[in-house]
Amino acid sequence: MTIALGTFTKEENDLFDIMDDWLRRDRFVFVGWSGLLLFPCAYFALGGWFTGTTFVTSWYTHGLASSYLEGCNFLTAAVSTPANSLAHSLLLLWGPEAQGDFTRWCQLGGLWTFVALHGAFGLIGFMLRQFELARSVQLRPYNAIAFSGPIAVFVSVFLIYPLGQSGWFFAPSFGVAAIFRFILFFQGFHNWTLNPFHMMGVAGVLGAALLCAIHGATVENTLFEDGDGANTFRAFNPTQAEETYSMVTANRFWSQIFGVAFSNKRWLHFFMLFVPVTGLWMSAIGVVGLALNLRAYDFVSQEIRAAEDPEFETFYTKNILLNEGIRAWMAAQDQPHENLIFPEEVLPRGNAL
């Protein structure tokens, strides 16, 4: 009988193995297969945004100045959406709109679709990066799952919402003041603050902030092996074998404060994951609803009574009037291509006037 010793090895020159070895080897900045999507898309998205905010005007799409070159600052510069007449065109540089002319492409708003699409794929690449690294070091993939929340919000707001409307024009432009304008637009045209999905989103984000503050303070409060003298940084010593904080003490403290407390670390940290991610997903679902022009809560009985009785008004009816004002004043400013002119007598006024 013949016994063969040693291991069977594949052909060393296999292209996939060579690429896999190079992409996933241990280095200061991990690349990975996900990096083939992440790094180019992130580079182009950020590069497009810096280019647009520095040099490109929004005069031809919105009738606005939007670049540092025109006098804007960091808060007012933006990469603005294409004109409404371009609908949902991808606005490729070589497409029928720009016909390979880079200057014309920028004037038409081509940088917005460029930044939006590369940004979306860059975020997806970052989530895949977390999956890939988690698999490499044998972790659960909850980081990647949690990051699906911001991705869902980005995709719903910047892509799905304008796809449900008449064009990319109604998406947010990429800038601070531009996002504020979009928020006012959402309130005036969709009554977004009274939408239950927005309420769940606010509860999730603010609830997560509260949980983070409570959790961080509690762990700091219950650290032990805390060093000697004024130096407290030994609490973070990575070579300390045992735990650095007391879960039992934390449980007793919050049991006395609230009457209830987490007794299990896994449930506690899952809850801290669940609250913000669920909130972000609910917000994203709500924005998808707005893309289809679904309405928020309507308390019609209060509106009818307020219209009939000058002395009856609620915070809801006042908000409805404010929304009408936003629509009337904003539409003419925000959609100059419609040539909207509202006479004074049709502009909304509250009962107090």
UniProtKB/Swiss-Prot annotation:
Q: Identify residues that carry Phosphothreonine.
A: T2
Where does this protein come from, organism-wise? Drimys granadensis
Compartments it resides in: Plastid, Chloroplast thylakoid membrane
From the UniProt record, which GO molecular function terms apply? chlorophyll binding; electron transporter, transferring electrons within the cyclic electron transport pathway of photosynthesis activity; iron ion binding; oxygen evolving activity
Taxonomic lineage of this organism?
Eukaryota, Viridiplantae, Streptophyta, Embryophyta, Tracheophyta
Designated gene of the protein: psbD
Q: Which positions bear N-acetylthreonine?
A: T2
Alphabetically ordered keywords of this record? Acetylation, Chlorophyll, Chloroplast, Chromophore, Electron transport, Iron, Magnesium, Membrane, Metal-binding, Oxidoreductase, Phosphoprotein, Photosynthesis, Photosystem II, Plastid, Thylakoid, Transmembrane, Transmembrane helix, Transport
- State the function annotated in the UniProt record: Photosystem II (PSII) is a light-driven water:plastoquinone oxidoreductase that uses light energy to abstract electrons from H(2)O, generating O(2) and a proton gradient subsequently used for ATP formation. It consists of a core antenna complex that captures photons, and an electron transfer chain that converts photonic excitation into a charge separation. The D1/D2 (PsbA/PsbD) reaction center heterodimer binds P680, the primary electron donor of PSII as well as several subsequent electron acceptors. D2 is needed for assembly of a stable PSII complex.
Name-wise, this protein is Photosystem II D2 protein
